[in-house]
Amino acid sequence: LVGSEMCIRDSYYRTDALMLSGETAYGKYPVEAVKTMTKVAAQAEKDKLPDNDIRIPLDENSNDVTAFLAKQAVKATTKLKIRAIITDSYSGRTARNLAAFRGKYPVLAICYKEKTMRHLALSYGVEAIYMPELANGQEYYFAALRRLLQEGRLQPTDMVGYLSSGKAGTQTSFLEINVVEDALKHANESVLPNCNRYL
């Protein structure tokens, strides 16, 4: 029971993932134990209390642009009507940075690699989605928006934050905030030919 009590407490402190102890999992009622912990975790997600947040300060001397932008994106969800934060991801680093700040709305990580998608499955608040890379980075973002709309993860009137880099293979360098339908309305004007990213 002690392991289960710890899982419950950890749920309220917004842990990334839960793992039942061997004793619980191999006990008389392993399926019931998993079902119960699933219910508890789901309820804990609904009952989020700001007091349970563990503050993650940024070092004043840090030059970590990704962490800075991730924190600002999560902060923006408390000031604006942002319903999701989208990031495209090779390694999952930006999505994990976003998860660290424990935002209220989901992080939709559009992953270039299936392996990255699997790794992000354990990150708090991250919904990892695999989508093969396109030649044009801007078109990748617009294709992701269309897919998220089609799957019902976003609505046309939703405001979203988007974190990405200006150049493939470099760290996150910008945060863009748009209403989905407005971004898509101007997609054809925004996509530059032979452009890997925005720069």
Describe these PLM feature segments:
Residues 36-73, 188-198:
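Long, charged amphipathic helices and adjacent flexible linkers at domain junctions
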Residues 21, 27, 46-56, 83, ...:
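Flexible, glycine/charged-enriched surface loops at secondary-structure junctions
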Residues 146, 155-163, 167-168, 173-185:
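C-terminal binding/interaction regions
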Residues 94-96, 102-140:
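Nucleotide-binding motor/catalytic cores of P-loop/tubulin-like NTPases across gene-expression machines
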Residues 9-30:
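Glycine-rich phosphate-binding active-site loops on the catalytic face of alpha/beta enzymes
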Residues 24-46, 173-179:
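C-terminal helical cap(s) of enzyme catalytic domains, especially alpha/beta-barrels
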Residues 68-82, 141-152, 158:
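Phosphate-interacting basic helix/loop segments used at nucleotide- and nucleic-acid interfaces
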Residues 1-8:
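Short, small-residue-biased leader/transition segments that mark boundaries at the very start
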